[in-house]
């Protein structure tokens, strides 16, 4: 998955970088930013790419959690 594909899917899914980072279990949006950055891009892990593509194809979204 290219950085352009990753970013396009993230946007289609309606997530900002921080929201996607939380969903994927990353501590901050920095990792998602690294996946999308033009300079020194970090390879998107295969499992993350598969999850993004599955969510994009099926329209699945994680359930929202009510904040107390």
Q: What are the roles of these predicted feature ranges?
A:
Residues 1-12:
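A short, Lys/Arg-rich alpha-helix, primarily the initiator
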Residues 13, 24-25:
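Core residues of bacterial helix-turn-helix
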């Amino acid at each position: 998955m290219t950085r352009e594909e990753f970013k396009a899917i993230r946007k289609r899914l309606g997530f900002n970088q921080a929201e996607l980072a939380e969903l994927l279990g990353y501590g901050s949006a920095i990792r998602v930013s690294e996946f999308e950055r033009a300079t020194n891009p970090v390879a998107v892990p295969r499992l993350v790419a598969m999850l993004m593509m599955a969510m994009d194809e099926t329209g699945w979204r994680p359930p929202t959690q009510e904040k107390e």
